[in-house]
């Protein structure tokens, strides 16, 4: 009689869909959130990262499929040959470029192009939905223990799903500010020279 224990649990699922927009036109909110009929509130919109070009010659793709080719080197010298899935490629070699025609080089990011927009030119047409900020499931758990005139209340909150856009880390790792040190992950995994296998 002197001891009591109460517990409660709740769970909810977040399902949303944009049914109608003014004039039915999709638009970009704040250069990050993509709003379109049939889409979801909280959709991130941007470029999708594939990898970092290891060499200048790594910016090479097979005609038609746009599969990335592997340049062949011997003693550090490019042999003017490429492999596709381990086999020598003899077709036309395509490159990805900026809108001004400048090709990407070693150390640049290899951005994905969506189906239907694969022309090798990385521009606004290559931005796509890359995630959603809203969790799929949220809920809570609370419990209370009471003994005579003493009580202890504990509460937990949880969420599952949903991506996080860390704006602070983005600015920290952009090398925009002289007094800011990038994160160790960026420091140790940044491309510095031809042949480096890097993430950034």
Predicted regions and their residues:
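Conserved small-residue
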Residues: 2-129, 173, 184, 188-200
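Residues that define the transmembrane beta-barrel architecture of outer-membrane proteins
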Residues: 3, 135-139
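Transmembrane beta-strands of outer-membrane beta-barrel proteins
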Residues: 5-7, 141, 147, 152-154
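Transmembrane beta-strands of outer-membrane beta-barrel pores
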Residues: 11-17, 147-149, 158-162
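Short, hydrophobic/aromatic alpha-helical segments in well-folded domains
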Residues: 123-126, 138-141, 146, 159
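C-terminal beta-barrel architecture of Gram-negative outer-membrane proteins
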Residues: 152-200
């Amino acid at each position: 009689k002197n001891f009591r224990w109460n517990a409660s649990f709740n769970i909810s699922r977040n399902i949303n869909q944009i049914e109608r927009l003014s004039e039915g036109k999709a638009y970009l909110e704040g250069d990050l959130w993509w709003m379109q009929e049939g889409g979801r509130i909280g959709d991130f919109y941007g470029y999708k990262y594939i990898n970092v070009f290891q060499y200048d010659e790594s910016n090479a793709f097979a005609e038609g499929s746009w599969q990335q080719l592997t340049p062949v080197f011997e003693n550090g010298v490019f042999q003017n040959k490429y492999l596709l899935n381990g086999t020598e490629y003899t077709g036309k070699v395509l490159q990805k470029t900026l809108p001004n025609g400048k090709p990407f080089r070693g150390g640049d990011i290899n951005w994905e192009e969506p189906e239907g927009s694969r022309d090798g030119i990385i521009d606004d047409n290559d931005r796509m939905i890359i995630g959603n900020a809203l969790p799929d499931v949220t809920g809570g758990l609370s419990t209370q223990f009471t003994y005579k005139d003493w009580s202890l209340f504990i509460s937990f909150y949880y969420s599952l799903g949903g991506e996080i856009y860390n704006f602070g880390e983005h600015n920290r790792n952009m090398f925009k500010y002289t007094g800011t040190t990038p994160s160790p992950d960026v420091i140790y995994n940044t491309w510095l020279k031809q042949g480096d296998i890097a993430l950034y």
